């Protein structure tokens, strides 16, 4: 059994982690999120559905991925992108020298059409099918709440 003290991340073997101290970052938990996203192939799904664009620096899929990480880390406003643009954890996780700026994010979001919303729905459906097995009926979970009647 592996312990957390001796591990490397699969999405980028240059990263390893231990809990013996050193430089701290309040956003370093994103490395574990990146590992999860890598293992389920979510980044490949984004590229499959949104990867065919001609933007040179920040593709639609990379802007979406950046927004996902920003929200997971608690940066819910798109103007946080300007403060995080060169953050070492974010640039490492997104594998970029610089993140998309707030205006780039706004332009990307404002360019979405119904076909893009349909792509998001397809991604959600794919993730659901990946994680849900209707034939697995060994466990039934009943969520019961008490009520005052």
Q: What spans do the regions from the language model cover?
A:
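Dynamic "connector" segments at or just before major functional cores
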Residues: 1-149
């Amino acid at each position: 059994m592996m312990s957390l003290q001796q591990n490397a991340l699969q999405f980028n073997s240059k990263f390893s982690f231990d809990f013996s101290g050193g430089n701290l970052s309040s956003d370093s938990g994103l490395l574990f999120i990146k590992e999860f996203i890598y293992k389920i192939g979510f980044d490949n799904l984004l590229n499959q559905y949104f990867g065919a664009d001609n933007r040179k620096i920040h593709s639609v899929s990379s802007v979406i991925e950046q927004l996902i990480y920003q929200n997971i880390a608690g940066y819910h406003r798109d103007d946080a992108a300007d403060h995080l643009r060169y953050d070492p954890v974010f640039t490492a996780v997104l594998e970029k020298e610089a993140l998309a700026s707030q205006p780039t994010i706004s332009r990307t979001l404002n360019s979405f059409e119904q076909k893009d919303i349909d792509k998001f729905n397809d991604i959600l459906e794919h993730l659901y099918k990946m994680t849900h097995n209707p034939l697995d009926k060994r466990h039934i979970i009943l969520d019961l709440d008490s009520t005052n009647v």
